[in-house]
Amino acid sequence: MTKPTILTGDRPTGKLHIGHYVGSLQNRVKMQNEDKYNMFVFLADQQALTDHAKEPELIRQSVGDVALDYLAAGLDPEKSTIFIQSQIPELAELSMYYMNLVSLARLERNPTVKTEIAQKAFGESIPAGFLVYPVSQAADITAFKATHVPVGNDQKPMIEQTREIVRSFNNAYHTDVLVEPEGIYPENEAAGRLPGLDGNAKMSKSLGNGIFLADDMDTLKKKVMSMYTDPDHIKVEDPGKIEGNMVFHYLDVFGKAEDAEQISEMKAQYQAGGLGDVKTKRFLLDVLDRELSPIRERRIEFAQNMDYVYDMLKAGSLKAQAVASQTLDEVKSAMGINYFK
């Protein structure tokens, strides 16, 4: 029986933070180790350039950083094909063919794209590459005939757009070459979109409100001790709110089964009064360090041998290119533009 194929990846615009870890990376490692899937994991550097075209040095540095984060978190190049998007030219060619099947109006209606355009404040200067990046995503997914794509709930419109492109292509060219993917969405809503340390809905490097997998213990401690809690909880004896309190939100996400009873007791005590923010933050620091210290240590080890990291990326890219090339041949054959045998 053929294994389902998983495609997943990240835009390399900086080091990965713990929101990436609980939102997707942790689950990728789990699926990889189950040995039930063909796993493709990629660094979407071309997509990153759609809104960082004048910062190629940032993208180049980030490719290495994200690759380190992948390896440190447990992705294994023996079990997952890890590759760089720009090193697979077949993806750009597939994108060109798919763009002919999607209207500009449909791209502009994509809710995810509309939200991101507003967030980035492009105004009237929206890069064309950014507007059409859902088509590029469709090329990424279909090139490897991915059956399943793990994404956040905010990416559902992207999966649906890919499915539309697949149906449009297969209908137009009377073929079944392309596979309609299914999205895999987070089961844990709290982990699916981890807020920033300051309570902002989004954790990001630009907002300075994230904990990164590469952060050392001193940095982690400073960030945890500065976290947003209940602004009205001034004295230890004051009753406090746990809703919107980032310390308790993070404890819900990162706490293990063995922590559940203590977390429950802390919530009750905090709400009744008698538990200070410093104590809750120290407990969270221990919980986070338990999770992150092995990742941090592995990352330091891999960073000492970047030749290995780039050799791994090169090997993965060559392996991925062979698969994408086969799909492109099938696509061109279906379209009738395979002129030379």
UniProtKB/Swiss-Prot annotation:
Short sequence motif 'KMSKS' region: positions: 202-206
Enzyme category, top tier: ligase
GO CC entries: cytosol
Any one GO MF term held by the record is: tryptophan-tRNA ligase activity
Record keyword Protein biosynthesis present: yes
Superkingdom: Bacteria
- Where are the coiled-coil regions? none
Q: Name one Pfam family in it.
A: tRNA-synt_1b
The UniProt annotation puts motif 'HIGH' region at 12-20
Q: What is its main location?
A: cytoplasm
Q: State the UniProt keywords alphabetically.
A: Aminoacyl-tRNA synthetase, ATP-binding, Cytoplasm, Ligase, Nucleotide-binding, Protein biosynthesis
One GO BP: tryptophanyl-tRNA aminoacylation
* Cross-referenced SUPFAM superfamilies: Nucleotidylyl transferase
Q: Which NCBIfam families match?
A: trpS
Give the family this protein belongs to, as stated in its UniProt record.
Belongs to the class-I aminoacyl-tRNA synthetase family.
- State the name under which the record lists this protein: Tryptophan--tRNA ligase
* Native organism: Lactococcus lactis subsp. lactis (strain IL1403) (Streptococcus lactis)
